[in-house]
Curated annotation (Swiss-Prot):
Species this chain originates from: Mus musculus
Residue stretches spanning the membrane: none
Residue ranges of the region described as Disordered: 22-56
Annotated PANTHER family: ALPHA-DEFENSIN 1 (PTHR11876), ALPHA-DEFENSIN 1-RELATED (PTHR11876:SF2)
Protein name from the UniProt record: Alpha-defensin 7
SS bonds (residue pairs): C64-C92, C66-C81, C71-C91
Tissue specificity note: Paneth cells of the small bowel.
A GO cellular component annotation in the UniProt record: extracellular space
PROSITE patterns assigned: DEFENSIN (PS00269)
Length: 93
């Protein structure tokens, strides 16, 4: 059940990222790595604000990052992120 919820949330996150309009500005068309680009945090939460069985400790504390060079220790790859035309690795812990 937890795995199904986690996978559903990640699929919804992927659809949301793809639904954002692509804006080609001068900053986004540069291919060199910008400082801080390696640690772009994405917070994922589950359930309603009043609390439910979906808001267990393990699910509420899920933190994901869009990384350029792969996942760090204690993180696992959960897919890809896209910002403009650049693709990143989605790493969660």
């Amino acid at each position: 059940m937890k795995t199904l919820i986690l996978l559903s949330a990640l699929v919804l996150l992927a659809f949301q990222v793809q639904a954002d309009p692509i804006q080609n500005t001068d900053e986004e068309t540069k291919t060199e790595e910008q400082p801080g680009e390696d640690d772009q945090a994405v917070s994922v939460s589950f359930g309603d604000p009043e609390g439910s069985s979906l808001q267990e400790e393990s699910l509420r504390d899920l933190v994901c990052y869009c990384r350029t060079r792969g996942c760090k220790r204690r993180e696992h790859m959960n897919g890809t992120c896209r910002k403009g035309h650049l693709m990143y690795t989605l790493c969660c812990r």
